[in-house]
Amino acid sequence: MEAPDYEVLSVREQLFHERIRECIISTLLFATLYILCHIFLTRFKKPAEFTTVDDEDATVNKIALELCTFTLAIALGAVLLLPFSIISNEVLLSLPRNYYIQWLNGSLIHGLWNLVFLFSNLSLIFLMPFAYFFTESEGFAGSRKGVLGRVYETVVMLMLLTLLVLGMVWVASAIVDKNKANRESLYDFWEYYLPYLYSCISFLGVLLLLVCTPLGLARMFSVTGKLLVKPRLLEDLEEQLYCSAFEEAALTRRICNPTSCWLPLDMELLHRQVLALQTQRVLLEKRRKASAWQRNLGYPLAMLCLLVLTGLSVLIVAIHILELLIDEAAMPRGMQGTSLGQVSFSKLGSFGAVIQVVLIFYLMVSSVVGFYSSPLFRSLRPRWHDTAMTQIIGNCVCLLVLSSALPVFSRTLGLTRFDLLGDFGRFNWLGNFYIVFLYNAAFAGLTTLCLVKTFTAAVRAELIRAFGLDRLPLPVSGFPQASRKTQHQ
Protein backbone atom coordinates (compact mmCIF):
# COMPACT_ATOMS: atom_id res chain seq x y z
CA MET A 1 0.00 0.00 0.00
CA GLU A 2 1.40 3.39 -1.01
CA ALA A 3 1.86 6.42 1.28
CA PRO A 4 -1.20 8.34 -0.02
CA ASP A 5 -3.36 5.30 0.74
CA TYR A 6 -2.07 5.27 4.33
CA GLU A 7 -2.87 8.96 4.66
CA VAL A 8 -6.40 8.44 3.36
CA LEU A 9 -6.87 5.48 5.71
CA SER A 10 -5.57 7.45 8.70
CA VAL A 11 -7.94 10.32 7.91
CA ARG A 12 -10.86 7.90 7.68
CA GLU A 13 -9.88 6.27 10.96
CA GLN A 14 -9.64 9.65 12.64
CA LEU A 15 -13.07 10.69 11.36
CA PHE A 16 -14.50 7.35 12.47
CA HIS A 17 -13.05 7.68 15.99
CA GLU A 18 -14.28 11.27 16.28
CA ARG A 19 -17.76 10.20 15.25
CA ILE A 20 -17.80 7.35 17.77
CA ARG A 21 -16.52 9.70 20.47
CA GLU A 22 -19.27 12.23 19.74
CA CYS A 23 -21.92 9.49 19.91
CA ILE A 24 -20.57 8.25 23.27
CA ILE A 25 -20.45 11.77 24.75
CA SER A 26 -23.97 12.58 23.52
CA THR A 27 -25.29 9.29 24.92
CA LEU A 28 -23.66 9.87 28.31
CA LEU A 29 -25.01 13.42 28.50
CA PHE A 30 -28.52 12.31 27.60
CA ALA A 31 -28.40 9.37 30.04
CA THR A 32 -27.42 11.73 32.85
CA LEU A 33 -30.26 14.13 32.02
CA TYR A 34 -32.70 11.23 31.70
CA ILE A 35 -31.83 9.85 35.16
CA LEU A 36 -32.16 13.29 36.77
CA CYS A 37 -35.54 13.91 35.10
CA HIS A 38 -36.81 10.46 36.08
CA ILE A 39 -35.93 11.11 39.73
CA PHE A 40 -37.62 14.51 39.49
CA LEU A 41 -40.85 13.20 37.97
CA THR A 42 -41.18 10.34 40.45
CA ARG A 43 -41.34 12.96 43.22
CA PHE A 44 -44.47 14.51 41.71
CA LYS A 45 -46.44 11.60 40.23
CA LYS A 46 -49.41 10.07 42.00
CA PRO A 47 -48.30 6.73 43.48
CA ALA A 48 -51.88 5.43 43.26
CA GLU A 49 -51.81 5.60 39.45
CA PHE A 50 -48.88 3.17 39.31
CA THR A 51 -50.01 0.71 41.99
CA THR A 52 -53.60 0.17 40.90
CA VAL A 53 -55.32 -3.21 40.86
CA ASP A 54 -55.64 -2.94 37.09
CA ASP A 55 -52.22 -3.88 35.69
CA GLU A 56 -53.18 -2.46 32.30
CA ASP A 57 -53.62 1.09 33.60
CA ALA A 58 -50.39 0.84 35.59
CA THR A 59 -48.48 -0.30 32.47
CA VAL A 60 -49.95 2.53 30.40
CA ASN A 61 -49.00 5.09 33.04
CA LYS A 62 -45.45 3.72 33.24
CA ILE A 63 -45.01 3.99 29.47
CA ALA A 64 -46.41 7.53 29.50
CA LEU A 65 -44.08 8.44 32.37
CA GLU A 66 -41.05 7.23 30.40
CA LEU A 67 -42.11 9.34 27.42
CA CYS A 68 -42.52 12.35 29.72
CA THR A 69 -39.07 11.68 31.18
CA PHE A 70 -37.60 11.64 27.68
CA THR A 71 -39.33 14.93 26.83
CA LEU A 72 -38.23 16.60 30.05
CA ALA A 73 -34.64 15.46 29.44
CA ILE A 74 -34.75 17.09 26.00
CA ALA A 75 -36.16 20.27 27.59
CA LEU A 76 -33.32 20.34 30.11
CA GLY A 77 -30.84 19.74 27.29
CA ALA A 78 -32.32 22.69 25.38
CA VAL A 79 -31.82 24.89 28.45
CA LEU A 80 -28.17 23.83 28.77
CA LEU A 81 -27.49 24.06 25.04
CA LEU A 82 -26.58 27.73 24.71
CA PRO A 83 -24.68 28.06 28.03
CA PHE A 84 -22.69 24.90 27.24
CA SER A 85 -21.81 26.27 23.81
CA ILE A 86 -20.68 29.63 25.22
CA ILE A 87 -18.54 28.01 27.91
CA SER A 88 -17.06 25.56 25.39
CA ASN A 89 -16.03 28.43 23.13
CA GLU A 90 -14.26 30.19 26.01
CA VAL A 91 -12.52 26.97 27.08
CA LEU A 92 -11.26 26.40 23.53
CA LEU A 93 -10.03 30.00 23.44
CA SER A 94 -8.16 29.61 26.73
CA LEU A 95 -6.76 26.11 26.04
CA PRO A 96 -6.54 25.76 22.26
CA ARG A 97 -4.17 22.78 22.12
CA ASN A 98 -4.82 20.97 25.37
CA TYR A 99 -4.75 17.19 24.98
CA TYR A 100 -7.53 16.57 27.53
CA ILE A 101 -10.14 18.72 25.78
CA GLN A 102 -9.71 17.42 22.26
CA TRP A 103 -13.16 15.89 22.54
CA LEU A 104 -14.63 19.40 22.84
CA ASN A 105 -14.89 20.73 19.30
CA GLY A 106 -17.27 22.46 16.94
CA SER A 107 -18.52 19.21 15.45
CA LEU A 108 -19.71 17.98 18.86
CA ILE A 109 -21.48 21.27 19.67
CA HIS A 110 -23.14 21.38 16.25
CA GLY A 111 -24.25 17.77 16.63
CA LEU A 112 -25.81 18.50 20.03
CA TRP A 113 -27.78 21.41 18.55
CA ASN A 114 -29.06 19.16 15.75
CA LEU A 115 -30.00 16.38 18.19
CA VAL A 116 -31.92 18.76 20.45
CA PHE A 117 -33.76 20.20 17.45
CA LEU A 118 -34.62 16.71 16.14
CA PHE A 119 -35.81 15.29 19.46
CA SER A 120 -37.74 18.47 20.29
CA ASN A 121 -39.68 18.02 17.05
CA LEU A 122 -40.17 14.34 17.81
CA SER A 123 -41.41 14.98 21.35
CA LEU A 124 -43.76 17.86 20.53
CA ILE A 125 -45.29 16.38 17.39
CA PHE A 126 -45.37 12.65 18.12
CA LEU A 127 -44.34 11.49 21.62
CA MET A 128 -46.40 13.81 23.81
CA PRO A 129 -49.62 13.46 21.75
CA PHE A 130 -49.04 9.70 21.80
CA ALA A 131 -48.61 9.74 25.59
CA TYR A 132 -51.82 11.75 26.08
CA PHE A 133 -53.94 9.65 23.72
CA PHE A 134 -52.43 6.49 25.21
CA THR A 135 -53.49 7.40 28.75
CA GLU A 136 -56.99 8.40 27.61
CA SER A 137 -57.58 5.46 25.24
CA GLU A 138 -59.67 2.40 26.06
CA GLY A 139 -59.39 0.43 22.84
CA PHE A 140 -61.82 0.20 19.94
CA ALA A 141 -65.34 -1.03 20.60
CA GLY A 142 -65.56 -4.78 20.11
CA SER A 143 -61.79 -5.33 20.24
CA ARG A 144 -59.98 -7.28 22.91
CA LYS A 145 -59.04 -5.33 25.99
CA GLY A 146 -55.36 -4.84 26.66
CA VAL A 147 -52.39 -2.60 26.08
CA LEU A 148 -52.17 -3.60 22.41
CA GLY A 149 -55.74 -2.45 21.77
CA ARG A 150 -54.92 0.91 23.31
CA VAL A 151 -51.84 1.16 21.11
CA TYR A 152 -53.96 0.60 17.98
CA GLU A 153 -56.43 3.30 18.99
CA THR A 154 -53.62 5.71 19.90
CA VAL A 155 -51.83 5.18 16.59
CA VAL A 156 -55.03 5.83 14.64
CA MET A 157 -55.73 9.00 16.64
CA LEU A 158 -52.15 10.15 16.17
CA MET A 159 -52.33 9.60 12.40
CA LEU A 160 -55.54 11.63 12.19
CA LEU A 161 -53.99 14.40 14.28
CA THR A 162 -50.87 14.38 12.08
CA LEU A 163 -52.97 14.74 8.94
CA LEU A 164 -54.94 17.57 10.52
CA VAL A 165 -51.83 19.46 11.66
CA LEU A 166 -50.08 18.84 8.32
CA GLY A 167 -53.07 20.24 6.46
CA MET A 168 -53.16 23.31 8.68
CA VAL A 169 -49.43 23.88 8.20
CA TRP A 170 -49.78 23.44 4.44
CA VAL A 171 -52.60 25.99 4.29
CA ALA A 172 -50.74 28.43 6.56
CA SER A 173 -47.53 28.16 4.55
CA ALA A 174 -49.48 28.62 1.31
CA ILE A 175 -51.08 31.78 2.67
CA VAL A 176 -47.84 33.23 4.02
CA ASP A 177 -45.58 32.05 1.18
CA LYS A 178 -46.97 32.94 -2.23
CA ASN A 179 -44.78 30.37 -3.95
CA LYS A 180 -47.03 28.18 -6.08
CA ALA A 181 -44.79 25.11 -5.82
CA ASN A 182 -45.22 24.97 -2.05
CA ARG A 183 -48.99 25.02 -2.45
CA GLU A 184 -49.00 22.18 -4.93
CA SER A 185 -46.43 19.78 -3.43
CA LEU A 186 -46.16 17.94 -0.13
CA TYR A 187 -43.00 16.05 -1.02
CA ASP A 188 -40.67 18.36 0.91
CA PHE A 189 -42.21 17.47 4.28
CA TRP A 190 -38.93 17.01 6.14
CA GLU A 191 -37.14 19.89 4.43
CA TYR A 192 -39.86 22.53 4.57
CA TYR A 193 -43.08 21.73 6.42
CA LEU A 194 -41.64 20.15 9.57
CA PRO A 195 -39.14 23.01 10.14
CA TYR A 196 -41.95 25.46 9.34
CA LEU A 197 -44.17 23.81 11.98
CA TYR A 198 -41.38 23.93 14.53
CA SER A 199 -40.75 27.56 13.58
CA CYS A 200 -44.38 28.34 14.45
CA ILE A 201 -44.09 26.44 17.74
CA SER A 202 -40.84 28.24 18.54
CA PHE A 203 -42.47 31.59 17.77
CA LEU A 204 -45.29 30.74 20.18
CA GLY A 205 -42.69 29.75 22.77
CA VAL A 206 -40.86 33.05 22.30
CA LEU A 207 -44.14 34.94 22.71
CA LEU A 208 -44.87 32.92 25.84
CA LEU A 209 -41.43 33.83 27.18
CA LEU A 210 -42.17 37.48 26.38
CA VAL A 211 -45.23 37.34 28.64
CA CYS A 212 -43.93 35.06 31.40
CA THR A 213 -40.40 36.42 31.86
CA PRO A 214 -41.31 40.01 32.92
CA LEU A 215 -43.95 38.60 35.26
CA GLY A 216 -41.42 36.13 36.65
CA LEU A 217 -38.78 38.83 37.11
CA ALA A 218 -41.22 40.75 39.28
CA ARG A 219 -42.29 37.61 41.16
CA MET A 220 -38.70 36.50 41.87
CA PHE A 221 -38.41 39.08 44.65
CA SER A 222 -41.46 37.81 46.53
CA VAL A 223 -40.53 34.14 45.95
CA THR A 224 -37.01 34.72 47.25
CA GLY A 225 -38.43 36.59 50.22
CA LYS A 226 -40.53 33.56 51.13
CA LEU A 227 -37.57 31.18 50.89
CA LEU A 228 -35.07 33.28 52.85
CA VAL A 229 -35.23 34.60 56.39
CA LYS A 230 -35.90 38.32 56.47
CA PRO A 231 -34.32 40.69 59.01
CA ARG A 232 -36.34 41.32 62.16
CA LEU A 233 -37.06 44.83 60.92
CA LEU A 234 -39.11 43.43 58.00
CA GLU A 235 -40.93 40.53 59.66
CA ASP A 236 -41.97 39.61 63.20
CA LEU A 237 -41.62 35.84 63.54
CA GLU A 238 -42.77 35.86 67.16
CA GLU A 239 -46.10 37.37 66.18
CA GLN A 240 -46.52 34.89 63.31
CA LEU A 241 -45.74 31.96 65.64
CA TYR A 242 -48.23 33.26 68.20
CA CYS A 243 -50.96 33.65 65.57
CA SER A 244 -50.25 30.20 64.14
CA ALA A 245 -50.38 28.56 67.58
CA PHE A 246 -53.59 30.45 68.41
CA GLU A 247 -55.30 29.32 65.18
CA GLU A 248 -54.14 25.74 65.71
CA ALA A 249 -55.52 25.72 69.26
CA ALA A 250 -58.86 27.12 68.06
CA LEU A 251 -59.19 24.47 65.34
CA THR A 252 -58.19 21.70 67.76
CA ARG A 253 -60.88 22.89 70.19
CA ARG A 254 -63.47 22.74 67.40
CA ILE A 255 -62.44 19.20 66.49
CA CYS A 256 -62.55 18.02 70.12
CA ASN A 257 -65.91 19.72 70.87
CA PRO A 258 -67.97 19.66 67.67
CA THR A 259 -71.23 20.18 69.61
CA SER A 260 -70.11 23.62 70.82
CA CYS A 261 -70.91 25.09 67.40
CA TRP A 262 -74.47 25.04 66.05
CA LEU A 263 -73.19 24.95 62.43
CA PRO A 264 -72.24 21.59 60.83
CA LEU A 265 -68.46 21.15 60.68
CA ASP A 266 -66.38 19.52 57.98
CA MET A 267 -63.99 17.42 60.05
CA GLU A 268 -61.80 16.47 57.10
CA LEU A 269 -61.31 20.12 56.18
CA LEU A 270 -60.49 21.00 59.79
CA HIS A 271 -57.90 18.22 59.99
CA ARG A 272 -56.25 19.47 56.79
CA GLN A 273 -56.15 23.01 58.17
CA VAL A 274 -54.55 21.78 61.40
CA LEU A 275 -51.89 19.87 59.46
CA ALA A 276 -51.18 22.94 57.33
CA LEU A 277 -50.82 25.11 60.44
CA GLN A 278 -48.50 22.57 62.06
CA THR A 279 -46.32 22.52 58.96
CA GLN A 280 -46.30 26.32 58.90
CA ARG A 281 -45.34 26.43 62.58
CA VAL A 282 -42.43 24.03 62.03
CA LEU A 283 -41.15 26.23 59.17
CA LEU A 284 -41.48 29.34 61.31
CA GLU A 285 -39.52 27.64 64.10
CA LYS A 286 -36.71 26.86 61.66
CA ARG A 287 -36.71 30.45 60.43
CA ARG A 288 -36.57 31.76 64.00
CA LYS A 289 -33.51 29.58 64.74
CA ALA A 290 -31.62 31.00 61.75
CA SER A 291 -28.28 32.63 62.48
CA ALA A 292 -27.73 36.37 62.45
CA TRP A 293 -25.64 36.05 59.25
CA GLN A 294 -28.50 34.37 57.41
CA ARG A 295 -31.00 36.87 58.74
CA ASN A 296 -29.12 40.14 58.30
CA LEU A 297 -26.83 39.34 55.36
CA GLY A 298 -28.45 36.61 53.24
CA TYR A 299 -31.72 38.40 52.45
CA PRO A 300 -30.19 41.80 51.50
CA LEU A 301 -27.53 40.14 49.34
CA ALA A 302 -30.13 38.00 47.55
CA MET A 303 -32.34 41.03 46.88
CA LEU A 304 -29.32 42.99 45.66
CA CYS A 305 -28.29 40.17 43.29
CA LEU A 306 -31.80 39.94 41.87
CA LEU A 307 -31.95 43.70 41.38
CA VAL A 308 -28.53 43.77 39.65
CA LEU A 309 -29.37 40.85 37.34
CA THR A 310 -32.75 42.32 36.42
CA GLY A 311 -31.33 45.78 35.80
CA LEU A 312 -28.48 44.32 33.77
CA SER A 313 -30.93 42.37 31.61
CA VAL A 314 -32.99 45.47 30.87
CA LEU A 315 -29.82 47.48 30.16
CA ILE A 316 -28.50 44.89 27.69
CA VAL A 317 -31.84 44.79 25.88
CA ALA A 318 -31.92 48.60 25.70
CA ILE A 319 -28.40 48.66 24.21
CA HIS A 320 -29.42 45.95 21.75
CA ILE A 321 -32.38 48.07 20.62
CA LEU A 322 -29.98 50.89 19.76
CA GLU A 323 -27.69 48.46 17.95
CA LEU A 324 -30.61 47.21 15.87
CA LEU A 325 -31.24 50.76 14.68
CA ILE A 326 -27.58 51.31 13.78
CA ASP A 327 -25.99 48.01 12.77
CA GLU A 328 -27.59 45.25 10.72
CA ALA A 329 -25.16 42.71 12.22
CA ALA A 330 -27.12 42.88 15.51
CA MET A 331 -29.94 40.88 13.91
CA PRO A 332 -30.10 37.22 15.03
CA ARG A 333 -28.92 34.81 12.38
CA GLY A 334 -27.83 31.23 11.97
CA MET A 335 -24.25 30.02 11.86
CA GLN A 336 -23.61 27.20 9.44
CA GLY A 337 -19.95 26.65 10.29
CA THR A 338 -18.80 24.53 13.21
CA SER A 339 -15.58 26.38 14.03
CA LEU A 340 -15.37 27.37 17.67
CA GLY A 341 -12.55 28.79 19.73
CA GLN A 342 -11.67 31.46 17.15
CA VAL A 343 -13.07 34.57 18.81
CA SER A 344 -14.94 35.37 22.02
CA PHE A 345 -18.63 36.16 21.73
CA SER A 346 -18.41 38.76 24.51
CA LYS A 347 -16.54 42.05 24.52
CA LEU A 348 -15.52 41.38 28.13
CA GLY A 349 -13.96 38.03 27.35
CA SER A 350 -14.43 35.13 29.74
CA PHE A 351 -15.97 37.36 32.40
CA GLY A 352 -18.60 38.56 29.95
CA ALA A 353 -19.30 34.96 28.89
CA VAL A 354 -19.93 34.00 32.52
CA ILE A 355 -22.32 36.95 32.87
CA GLN A 356 -24.15 35.82 29.72
CA VAL A 357 -24.56 32.29 31.09
CA VAL A 358 -25.82 33.59 34.45
CA LEU A 359 -28.33 35.89 32.74
CA ILE A 360 -29.61 33.08 30.51
CA PHE A 361 -30.21 30.80 33.49
CA TYR A 362 -31.75 33.65 35.48
CA LEU A 363 -34.21 34.52 32.73
CA MET A 364 -35.13 30.86 32.27
CA VAL A 365 -35.88 30.44 35.98
CA SER A 366 -37.83 33.71 35.95
CA SER A 367 -39.87 32.56 32.96
CA VAL A 368 -40.79 29.31 34.74
CA VAL A 369 -41.77 31.25 37.87
CA GLY A 370 -43.84 33.65 35.79
CA PHE A 371 -45.42 30.77 33.86
CA TYR A 372 -46.68 29.05 36.99
CA SER A 373 -47.68 32.38 38.56
CA SER A 374 -49.90 33.44 35.67
CA PRO A 375 -53.64 32.87 36.20
CA LEU A 376 -53.94 30.99 32.92
CA PHE A 377 -51.40 28.26 33.80
CA ARG A 378 -51.69 28.23 37.58
CA SER A 379 -53.81 25.07 37.49
CA LEU A 380 -50.91 23.22 35.80
CA ARG A 381 -48.65 23.74 38.80
CA PRO A 382 -47.39 20.29 39.91
CA ARG A 383 -47.98 19.11 43.46
CA TRP A 384 -45.71 16.88 45.51
CA HIS A 385 -46.83 13.23 45.06
CA ASP A 386 -50.24 14.47 43.87
CA THR A 387 -49.89 15.24 40.15
CA ALA A 388 -52.04 13.36 37.66
CA MET A 389 -50.49 11.79 34.57
CA THR A 390 -52.26 14.13 32.16
CA GLN A 391 -51.05 17.09 34.20
CA ILE A 392 -47.47 15.78 34.02
CA ILE A 393 -47.81 15.53 30.23
CA GLY A 394 -49.07 19.12 30.04
CA ASN A 395 -46.19 20.37 32.18
CA CYS A 396 -43.61 18.55 30.06
CA VAL A 397 -45.05 20.02 26.85
CA CYS A 398 -45.07 23.56 28.24
CA LEU A 399 -41.55 23.27 29.64
CA LEU A 400 -40.28 21.89 26.33
CA VAL A 401 -41.86 24.78 24.41
CA LEU A 402 -40.29 27.30 26.79
CA SER A 403 -36.85 25.68 26.87
CA SER A 404 -36.60 25.05 23.13
CA ALA A 405 -37.36 28.74 22.54
CA LEU A 406 -34.69 29.85 25.03
CA PRO A 407 -31.74 29.97 22.54
CA VAL A 408 -33.80 32.01 20.08
CA PHE A 409 -35.09 34.19 22.93
CA SER A 410 -31.58 34.90 24.24
CA ARG A 411 -30.17 35.71 20.80
CA THR A 412 -33.15 37.88 19.84
CA LEU A 413 -32.74 40.01 22.97
CA GLY A 414 -29.00 40.35 22.41
CA LEU A 415 -28.04 38.61 25.66
CA THR A 416 -25.31 36.80 23.73
CA ARG A 417 -23.51 37.15 20.41
CA PHE A 418 -23.40 33.39 19.93
CA ASP A 419 -25.21 32.77 16.66
CA LEU A 420 -27.79 30.01 16.40
CA LEU A 421 -26.49 26.68 15.13
CA GLY A 422 -28.23 24.11 12.96
CA ASP A 423 -31.91 24.44 12.19
CA PHE A 424 -32.44 26.92 15.04
CA GLY A 425 -31.15 29.64 12.73
CA ARG A 426 -33.50 28.74 9.87
CA PHE A 427 -36.62 30.28 11.38
CA ASN A 428 -38.25 32.64 8.89
CA TRP A 429 -39.24 35.36 11.33
CA LEU A 430 -35.68 35.86 12.65
CA GLY A 431 -34.81 37.95 9.59
CA ASN A 432 -37.75 40.32 10.04
CA PHE A 433 -36.43 43.58 11.51
CA TYR A 434 -39.81 44.82 12.71
CA ILE A 435 -40.60 41.63 14.64
CA VAL A 436 -37.18 41.59 16.34
CA PHE A 437 -37.27 45.33 17.14
CA LEU A 438 -40.81 45.28 18.52
CA TYR A 439 -40.00 42.16 20.53
CA ASN A 440 -37.03 43.86 22.21
CA ALA A 441 -39.01 47.02 22.89
CA ALA A 442 -41.94 45.04 24.32
CA PHE A 443 -39.65 43.04 26.61
CA ALA A 444 -37.91 46.14 27.96
CA GLY A 445 -41.22 47.95 28.45
CA LEU A 446 -43.05 45.05 30.11
CA THR A 447 -40.13 44.26 32.42
CA THR A 448 -39.80 47.88 33.50
CA LEU A 449 -43.56 48.18 34.03
CA CYS A 450 -43.75 44.99 36.12
CA LEU A 451 -40.78 46.02 38.27
CA VAL A 452 -42.09 49.54 38.86
CA LYS A 453 -45.51 48.20 39.78
CA THR A 454 -44.04 45.59 42.12
CA PHE A 455 -41.72 47.99 43.94
CA THR A 456 -44.27 50.78 44.23
CA ALA A 457 -46.82 48.32 45.62
CA ALA A 458 -44.24 46.99 48.11
CA VAL A 459 -43.22 50.50 49.20
CA ARG A 460 -46.86 51.54 49.51
CA ALA A 461 -47.64 48.50 51.67
CA GLU A 462 -44.61 49.15 53.90
CA LEU A 463 -45.60 52.82 54.34
CA ILE A 464 -49.16 51.85 55.23
CA ARG A 465 -47.82 49.32 57.73
CA ALA A 466 -45.29 51.79 59.15
CA PHE A 467 -47.91 54.49 59.80
CA GLY A 468 -50.33 51.95 61.23
CA LEU A 469 -52.98 52.59 58.60
CA ASP A 470 -53.50 48.85 58.11
CA ARG A 471 -55.07 48.68 61.61
CA LEU A 472 -57.74 51.25 60.81
CA PRO A 473 -61.30 49.87 60.47
CA LEU A 474 -62.41 49.70 56.85
CA PRO A 475 -65.80 51.25 55.99
CA VAL A 476 -68.60 48.85 55.16
CA SER A 477 -69.67 49.22 51.54
CA GLY A 478 -73.38 49.00 52.28
CA PHE A 479 -73.37 51.43 55.24
CA PRO A 480 -73.66 54.75 53.35
CA GLN A 481 -76.60 53.46 51.33
CA ALA A 482 -78.37 52.37 54.49
CA SER A 483 -77.77 55.78 56.08
CA ARG A 484 -79.30 57.52 53.07
CA LYS A 485 -82.42 55.36 53.40
CA THR A 486 -82.77 56.27 57.07
CA GLN A 487 -82.38 59.97 56.24
CA HIS A 488 -85.16 59.80 53.64
CA GLN A 489 -87.40 58.09 56.14
UniProtKB/Swiss-Prot annotation:
Keywords: Cell membrane, Endocytosis, Endoplasmic reticulum, Membrane, Receptor, Transmembrane, Transmembrane helix, Wnt signaling pathway. Expressed in testis, pituitary gland, adrenal gland, trachea, placenta, thymus, cerebellum, stomach, mammary gland, spinal cord. A weaker expression is detected in colon, pancreas, and prostate. The keyword Transmembrane helix applies. It is a multi-pass membrane protein. Pfam families: LMBR1. One of its GO terms (biological process) is hematopoietic stem cell differentiation. Residues 1-76 are annotated as: LCN1-binding. Residues 43-66, 136-154, 218-305, 372-388, 453-489 are cytoplasmic. Residues 1-59 are annotated as: Interaction with LGB. It is found in: Cell membrane; Endoplasmic reticulum membrane. Residues 1-21, 88-114, 176-196, 327-350, 410-431 are extracellular. Dimer. Can also form higher oligomers. Interacts with LCN1; this interaction mediates the endocytosis of LCN1. Interacts with UBAC2, FAF2, VCP, AMFR, ZNRF3, CTNNB1, LRP6, GSK3A and GSK3B. Interacts with DVL2 and RNF43. Interaction with SCGB1A1 has been observed in PubMed:16423471, but not in PubMed:23964685. Interaction with LGB which mediates the endocytosis of LGB has been observed in PubMed:17991420, but not in PubMed:23964685. Belongs to the LIMR family. This is Protein LMBR1L. It comes from Homo sapiens (Human). The gene is LMBR1L.
